[in-house]
Regions:
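Carbohydrate-active enzyme catalytic cores, enriched for enzymes
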Residues: 264-432, 487-489, 601
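Extreme N-terminal leader/anchor segments
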Residues: 2-52, 97-103
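Short coil/turn segments at secondary-structure boundaries
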Residues: 71, 130-134, 198-203, 307-314, ...
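CBM-like, beta-strand-rich accessory domains located in the C-terminal region of large
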Residues: 2, 151, 341-347, 441-616
Length: 616
């Protein structure tokens, strides 16, 4: 198919020509084609490769999973996402698996099925998932929209075509190019030059990096004309800054660790695609902010690779080993031995760098970047002042067994939960109490106006107060104003005023102060204290959220047991307290909300939770 004419005004024609002069004569993907038998024969003997080849033979026997219209349309009828998404992903993963198996085996055994699979995907109108095609424009092929999955699956398909090189017939490649122009390249060009940019071009969350990496990678791998390729590089150069605004200037990712793994991994991919194509002439890493973002994967860990599961981070998620290793390699912050392996099939394009050698284009080490790296070294603390996040750890070799994270922030963050005043308490490799994270899969209305009906997202499912029967309110004005931050080698104190998080819901409330105190002495102690004042008596309840088994071991004492660890919680409060418990389960492992309620309404008072490792 002939190239598309480039004659828009949004992306500078002069910049397109400048970038075109930097690009290679022919399109190039990530990694090496099947012809590099030194690489592929070496990989063939790895356990991951043997497993993949075995799975590919099973897939070949079963055939490509069908496109099922009723499953694609299921979401609009039921608000349940997974059936349609699983159907789409199974089709993509079938093809990726066969392509990698063919590169490994080099016997042409999978080529006929691969060609049929490529042709099926080209005939399939939507490449998006149903959640991003509510109006069914992609499904009907009337007005194509590029979403996260079009970008990532499209890039993976483009990389597969590059890897197979001349193994694919010219007719199959031509059909694929027609599909890419229809579903990816022309919709991007049209929205940038003729209508208005898709929302993700200027959004400040993971969508920006994910979609830019996918579209740019596909263009660099497929488009023969240098100026066409340069157009997509220039577009990425113009718009990537919006995604970076989603990280605070000190490097914090408000979407949580899981979306850092997704979004920043995508940004790394985008950076590598463009660095390699331009031989380092364009490098998005050349600022101090990116050095700070690169350090987030290490700084956010409390201890033993356990991280706080704030926002929509899934419980148990740790920073990607690839990201931390890649950043060490790029910045020279730790000894680095390059490792590469066959990845899983999910979001394959995001993991192609880690599959091949020569993974990291070294960043130019400026004095500003060097200064950032010097400032990051603190074994006991990590601080993100802009986000109101602190990590406090025990000293290496000490008797202290507790590590904690505490949170101020506000209630208008990316993938927001209403959770000002939240925290996480870790013993060993277990999160004993605190923020329990987000869903493992999203309900269909999770990103609608109904989202805050879910306790996993509203403050009821978090370890924060429930006052006069009211949860925290949403919005940036609902914030934790830092009153005190004292971090030492022994005791850390962090105090916030978060009255504003309840002010409009509980007008009687005059003041609500939460003080966190972490003490490294002995085996460690963590105290959460709330002090409140009101114009009249109010009902006051706080909560412990946990996936531990728990029991009362005294009138005002609880014990939490999880993964071989035991933690005691003492409750200090004026008068009698009442306890209740409730199970919270929203498409994620269930957890318990233990409500701790003052029996009588009070005009002022305080509640202290004192947590420490249980003693024999």
């Amino acid at each position: 198919m002939a190239k598309d004419e480039i004659h828009g005004n949004n992306i500078s024609a002069e910049r397109i020509r400048e970038i075109a002069d930097m690009l290679p004569e022919k399109p190039e993907g990530i990694g090496v084609t099947y012809k590099d038998r030194t690489y592929w024969d070496k990989m063939k003997n790895t356990p991951e490769a043997r497993k993949l080849i075995e799975e590919a033979h099973t897939s070949l026997k079963d055939g490509m999973p069908p496109f099922v219209d009723s499953l694609y349309l299921h979401l609009n009828k039921t608000e349940i996402r997974l059936p349609g998404e699983n159907m789409m992903n199974a089709r993509y993963q079938y093809l990726w698996r066969l392509v990698l198996a063919e590169c490994l085996e080099n016997k042409r055994r999978f080529i006929p099925a691969i060609c049929e699979g490529v042709e099926e995907l080209c005939r399939q109108k939507p490449w998006s998932i149903p959640a991003h095609d509510r109006n069914l424009h992609n499904y009907h092929g009337t007005d194509y929209y590029v979403d996260l999955v079009v970008a990532t699956a499209g890039n993976t398909l483009a990389q597969c075509i590059y890897l197979l090189d001349d193994r694919l017939p010219a007719e199959t490649k031509a059909l694929a190019m027609c599909a890419f122009r229809e579903k990816v390249f022309r919709p991007i060009y049209r929205c940038l030059e003729e209508t208005k940019p898709f929302y993700w071009f200027t959004v400040t969350n993971n969508w920006n990096s994910v979609c830019l990496a996918g579209v740019t990678g596909a263009a660099l791998a497929l488009l023969q004309d240098k100026e066409e390729r340069a157009y997509f590089v220039a577009a990425a150069e113009k718009y990537y800054v919006y995604g970076m605004k989603g990280y605070s200037d000190d490097g914090y990712c408000s979407e949580g660790v899981g979306y850092y793994n997704y979004g920043f991994c995508s940004f790394i991919l985008l950076r590598e695609e463009i660095c390699r194509a331009t031989k380092g002439k364009i490098d998005f890493f050349r600022t101090p902010k990116f050095a700070r973002i690169a350090q987030y994967g290490k700084k956010i860990q409390i201890m033993n690779q356990v991280c706080p599961a704030y926002a929509d981070c899934r419980a148990g998620v740790s920073p990607s080993w690839f990201i931390t290793n890649y950043c060490d390699n790029v910045l020279g912050t730790a000894p680095y031995e390059e490792k590469y392996k066959i990845p899983g099939m999910d979001n394959l394009s995001l993991h192609t760098i880690g599959m091949f050698p020569h993974q990291a284009w070294k960043v130019e080490m400026t004095p500003e970047i060097q200064e950032v790296l010097k400032a990051e070294a603190d074994e006991l603390h990590s601080c993100y002042d802009e986000a109101g996040i602190i990590i406090s750890r025990p000293a290496t070799g000490s008797t202290c067994r507790l590590g904690v994270s505490v949170k101020g922030g506000h209630n208008a963050e990316n993938h927001n939960h209403n959770d000002v005043g939240s925290y996480a308490v870790v013993m060993g490799s277990q999160t004993m109490a605190g923020d329990m994270g987000g869903p493992f899969s999203y309900p269909g209305d999770y990103f609608s106006g109904n989202a805050y009906k879910y306790p996993i997202k509203n403050s009821f499912g978090h370890p924060v107060p429930f006052i006069n029967g009211q949860c925290q309110v949403s919005g940036k004005k609902a914030q934790g104003v830092v009153l005190k931050k004292e971090l030492t080698g022994g005791t850390d104190i962090f105090q916030i005023d978060y009255t504003s998080a309840y002010a409009t819901a509980v007008p009687e409330l005059e003041k609500l102060i939460r003080t966190f105190t972490y003490n490294r002495a002995g085996e460690g102690t963590f105290v959460i204290e709330d002090r409140f004042e009101a114009v009249s008596g109010i009902s006051f309840e706080t909560a412990i959220t946990t996936r531990a088994d728990w029991k009362m071991i005294g009138n005002n004492r609880l014990e939490l047991v999880l993964g071989g660890e035991k933690m005691t919680v003492d409750i200090e409060a004026p008068g009698v307290v009442e306890f209740d418990s409730e199970t919270v389960e929203v498409n994620s492992p269930a957890y318990t909300r233990i409500g701790i309620r003052l029996k009588k309404p009070l005009q002022s008072g305080s509640v202290r939770l004192i947590m420490y490792p249980s003693r024999p």
